[in-house]
Amino acid sequence: MSKIVPYALIGVIGLAIVGLLRQRRRPIPTPPLLAFLFDNPLVEAFAGSELLAERLGLAPGMRVVDAGCGPGRLTIPFAKAVEPTGEVVALDSQRAMLEKLEHRLEAENITNVRTLEAGLGEWALDREAFDRVLLAFVLGEVRDREAAARELYAALKPGGILSVTEGFGDPDYRRPASVRREVEPAGFELVERFGGFPVYTLNFRRPENLAT
């Protein structure tokens, strides 16, 4: 706990800076310089990789999208969880974030991660190709959230899960009701809710194809 307190203080200051940077009409992603805000023991304590992997129901062989992956706090443990035949696509709109991740992948000799430089809503993901998609502290940074939801619906296999995790204190925090309004029109159905304050997760399923 003693190690968490300094990170909490730094986090509050950092989030305030991010908030000032985002006092504009359009959302912007977290700058690479402030990536540590979402890659530190404080965040791990409330939204750790093991906890989110459990909420996602990860299993070997799955294909997963870590959308807005940043420097890879979740990408790397998720890649290990889906080994040996699974794959994680690490998607981020910022090349600098992906470079941080690629250095970590090389250092740990992880080969089942594919990085993809693109924003949500740009339709860069393959159709009906993934079992799980994760949005952790990301949705509020997306400029067109409804378009992003449609893209992710198309990218998931029927029966696949979109998991949205949000944390109070994030300058782009989205309330559960807001998330549902932005995600469900794409065709998703809410199937699970975990946590509450300060961090919650909503799991949405793409329904199975109806028999004809």
Q: Residue locations for each model-derived region?
A:
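Class I SAM-dependent transferase core
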Residues: 2-59
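Class I SAM-dependent methyltransferase SAM/SAH-binding core
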Residues: 65-67, 71-123
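Helix-to-beta-strand junctions that scaffold the AdoMet/dcAdoMet cofactor pocket
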Residues: 82-83, 142-143, 156-158
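A short acidic, Gly/Pro-enriched loop at the edge of an enzyme's catalytic core
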Residues: 121-133
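A short SAM/SAH-binding and catalytic strip from SAM-dependent methyltransferases
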Residues: 131-144
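A short glycine-rich, Lys/Arg-flanked "PGG" loop and its adjoining helix->strand segment in the class I
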Residues: 146-161
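Conserved class I S-adenosyl-L-methionine
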Residues: 163-186
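Core SAM-dependent methyltransferase catalytic element
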Residues: 186, 195-212
